[in-house]
Amino acid sequence: MPSLCYGKINKPMKKLIKNWVHIPGLHCGSVALRDVITYHGYNLSEAMCFGIGGGLGFYYTVSEDISPTRMIFVRGPEMEPTFFSLIDKPTSWRHEKDEDKALETTKEWIDKDIPVLIQTDVRYLDYYNSSTNFPGHVVSVWGYDDETQTVFLADTGFEGLQAVSYEKFKKGRSSKAPANPLENNWIEVNLAKPIRSLCEVIPEALRQNARKMIEGRRGGRGESGVSMIRLWAEDLPNWKDAPDWKWCARFGYQVVKKRGVCGAGFRWLYRDFLTEAEEMLLPLRALRLSQKMDLIGNKWSNMSMILKEISEKEKPDRKLLSLASDKANELWESEQQFYRAVIEIQ
C-alpha cells in the first residue's frame, strides 16, 4: 500500500498591526511621521515632526518632459530619513527593483508589527480619483490581506485606513513619472531604544535645514535650496513663452497654497514648529525665529495669489510676471537672511 503524503495547505495570510495609529493632518510626510512615532509611544505634533525632519526646501525644474514644464516644489529632500536619523539612528530610504519582492518585504515587516513608510504616486491611489502623476507621496502601511489582494495604509487627511489593491500598490511604488521616479522606496520604522531628547535634537535640526537651504542639496527632484528661488525669480518673466504657461502658474499656486502645504509653502507649518521649539528652549525666544518665519509665510501666501491671478488671464500678463519675479526675489533675500542667522545658533 503506497504511503500517504500530507502536505501543508498555504492559506492566504492576513495581518493588521494592533493599535495602528492615524491622526489626519496637513502634509503626507509629516502626518506619516507623527502616526508611526505615536504608535511607538511618543507624543509629537505634526509640526514638530516636520521641523525635526527639516522639511523646508525649494526646487525649480524646467523640462519639456514634465507637466507643467516649469515646476516648483516647496518641500526639502529626505525629510523622513532625516527625522529618524536625528531622533534614533542613521536612516535612509531603502530601494528594491523587483516590485513583487518589495511587496513581500513590506508584508514581512507588518508581520513583525513594524509599520512601514513608503513613497508612492497619487495617480495609483483610487481614493484620490486623480489622473495626474504625483510621485513621492508618503504614506504609512499598517496591514495587508492576501485573500482580497489588498494593503491598508494611512494617508494625510483621510480618516481611518485606506484599502489599496496589490496591483495599484506596486504600480504606485515603482512609478517612473518625472520629476521624481521611484524604486519601491521604503523605511521600516523599528525604534529599538528611547529617542534622543528633543532639547538636543531641535537645535541640530534647525541648523541642518538651514545649511541644506544655503548650501543646496540634491534629492529625487533635483537640487533644493535658496539658490533655486533666485533662479526661479530670474526665469519667471520667461514663462510668457511657455506653451503651458497657465498650468505652470496654476500648479505653482496650488503647491504653495493648496496641496497640503499649510497655506504658505510649508513655511507656516515650520513656524508652528519654531513656536513649539521656543517654548522648550528659552534661548530661542530672543531670536524671534517663529515671528520671522511667519512673515516669510505671509510673503509666500501673497506670492501664491499672484500666481493664481496669472493663471486666470486669457494671455500671459507681462506686468504680473514681472511682479511675480520681484516678489520671488524678495523671498530669496528673506529666506537667505533667515537661514544664515539660524546657522549661527550655538
Sequence positions of predicted segments:
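Conserved active-site-adjacent core of cysteine acyl-enzyme catalytic domains
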Residues: 13-44, 54-194
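Charge-dense, low-complexity intrinsically disordered segments
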Residues: 23, 70, 93-96, 189, ...
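Short helix-capping/linker segments at secondary-structure and domain boundaries
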Residues: 38-47, 274-281
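Noncatalytic regulatory segments and standalone regulatory/sensor domains
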Residues: 146-262
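Charged, long alpha-helical assembly modules
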Residues: 254-346
